[in-house]
Amino acid sequence: MRGSLCLALAASILHVSLQGEFQRKLYKDLVKNYNPLERPVANDSLPLTVYFSLSLLQIMDVDEKNQVLTTNIWLQMTWTDHYLQWNASEYPGVKTVRFPDGQIWKPDILLYNSADERFDATFHTNVLVNSSGHCQYLPPGIFKSSCYIDVRWFPFDVQQCKLKFGSWSYGGWSLDLQMQEADISGYIPNGEWDLVGVLGKRSEKFYECCKEPYPDVTFTVSIRRRTLYYGLNLLIPCVLISALALLVFLLPADSGEKISLGITVLLSLTVFMLLVAEIMPATSDSVPLIAQYFASTMIIVGLSVVVTVIVLQYHHHDPDGGKMPKWTRVVLLNWCAWFLRMKRPGEDKVRPACQHNERRCSLASVEMSAVAGPPATNGNLLYIGFRGLDTMHCAPTPDSGVVCGRVACSPTHDEHLLHAGQPSEGDPDLAKILEEVRYIAHRFRCQDESEAVCSEWKFAACVVDRLCLMAFSVFTILCTIGILMSAPNFVEAVSKDFA
């Protein structure tokens, strides 16, 4: 038993020592007279075929401002080295050998659109070679490539970033670069971007320096932005802020906060606009979709502030500034009020105006009744005058627009009546009393007329507020739906990211 174990152990040791000896001998035979600068082909007039592919492991970063894509990629290059072939029977147990960087020939394939400071960002690994001379080179690397970022549909955008690989010094007559499909089976998902696909294309390009074509392999990485983050942090707050701007038209003009609310909303949108500008590239090729929405919302809010100033001007209009123009009264108080189904306060409770031919204001009757009375009633003359004024009704003028007949009494007609009924010169007390009555009546008439003018302007301000509320609401809804849904993949982004 012990003898058999000893024999087995000795055989295994002898086998290992023999295998190590064969491998050492193979390395010595292969590198003997081998020149890493020589292209390993049997016929120098024929090109060496190199098969190229890549494995995309991770999208690490997409820098929109600097337009740089950072990816974790494993390159895959295979070719046949004519000088690295051996007979497997002469070297039993040695199936593959590995050569470090610089010891054998390798294709100088680089990323053409590299944005890395070192340009070549690969980690140079060993080259795996089998007995038939088949070489396999798998260098990993963190690649930074320049990528044109089209922010037109941000944040519902899909980017197409290209990775162009090719030999830096070998032309198509010396090195035939062939493409193989990219491998994304080991891809690690990214929190900001979804990988749509990786498509490869081989092409040949002629440069002015050389007559021979230079083949290259271009892999197009298609990625779609995940919009949940931007929707919660930019879009939804903007929609809410634009909705708050509509509250400007619901605030009463006497509150004194209409302008403050409009300016506050405008400043809030400006802050969000600055946040978008910080992450977007400084390009004039296209305006981002979210910037278009912010700009339209800012225009709406800015116009609401302007309209609010007009509303406040109407509401606090000075009666001494004149009556409302006829066209303004027709447009606002008639057409717009009818369209908005608005009625003036107290419009249904109008005192009936007097008829021109039947009952007119007559201060003379008051005066004559006071004069015809006995002397004992002189102490109640002021009371009689007030009673007469209180029961007076006058017809409105056609251009006044005031429905209360008492307000629109013609001062010239009343003064004529008062002067027509002047008392005799022998009664100075009655003359003074009637003079005071005329003054009080004139003050009441002016006060009522001013209140009527103010009421007209205030009602016009309410009509403008209601009209702008409806118009701005419709415009805001149309802008929100029209701009955001114009993105080609809006429905796909909402269904995948917000579901």
Swiss-Prot record:
Residue ranges that the UniProt entry lists as topological domain Extracellular: 20-230
Disulphide-bonded residues: 147-161, 209-210
Transmembrane domains' residue ranges: 231-251, 259-279, 292-312, 467-487
Region (Essential for TMEM35A/NACHO-mediated proper subunit assembly and trafficking to cell membrane): 257-264
GO CC annotation: acetylcholine-gated channel complex; dendrite; neuron projection; plasma membrane; postsynaptic membrane; synapse
SUPFAM superfamilies on file: Neurotransmitter-gated ion-channel transmembrane pore, Nicotinic receptor ligand binding domain-like
Annotated control of activity: Activated by a myriad of ligands such as acetylcholine, cytisine, nicotine, choline and epibatidine. Oligomeric amyloid-beta protein 42 activates specifially CHRNA7:CHRNB2 nAchRs. Activity is modulated by positive allosteric modulators (PAMs), such as flavonoids, with a wide range of chemical diversity, pharmacological sensitivity and efficacy. AChR activity is inhibited by the antagonists alpha-conotoxons RgIA, ImI and ImII, small disulfide-constrained peptides from cone snails. Alpha-conotoxin PnIC selectively inhibits CHRNA7:CHRNB2 over CHRNA7 homopentamer.
CDD domains noted in UniProt: LGIC_ECD_nAChR_A7, LGIC_TM_cation
Sequence ranges on the Cytoplasmic membrane side: 313-466
Tissue: At least in chromaffin cells.
Protein's GO biological process: calcium ion transport; chemical synaptic transmission; cognition; intracellular calcium ion homeostasis; monoatomic ion transmembrane transport; negative regulation of cytokine production involved in inflammatory response; negative regulation of tumor necrosis factor production; positive regulation of angiogenesis
Cleaved signal peptide residues: 1-19
Domain of life: Eukaryota
Pfam family, one: Neur_chan_memb
PTM per Swiss-Prot/TrEMBL: Glycosylations at Asn-43, Asn-87 and Asn-130 are essential for TMEM35A/NACHO-mediated proper subunit assembly and trafficking to the cell membrane.
Record's bilayer topology term: Multi-pass membrane protein
Subcellular location: Postsynaptic cell membrane; Cell membrane
Binding site for Ca(2+): 39, 41, 169, 207
GO molecular function, one term: acetylcholine receptor activity
Role description: Component of neuronal acetylcholine receptors (nAChRs) that function as pentameric, ligand-gated cation channels with high calcium permeability among other activities. nAChRs are excitatory neurotrasnmitter receptors formed by a collection of nAChR subunits known to mediate synaptic transmission in the nervous system and the neuromuscular junction. Each nAchR subunit confers differential attributes to channel properties, including activation, deactivation and desensitization kinetics, pH sensitivity, cation permeability, and binding to allosteric modulators.
Family (UniProt): Belongs to the ligand-gated ion channel (TC 1.A.9) family. Acetylcholine receptor (TC 1.A.9.1) subfamily. Alpha-7/CHRNA7 sub-subfamily.
Record-given protein name: Neuronal acetylcholine receptor subunit alpha-7
Organism of origin: Bos taurus
Record gene name: CHRNA7
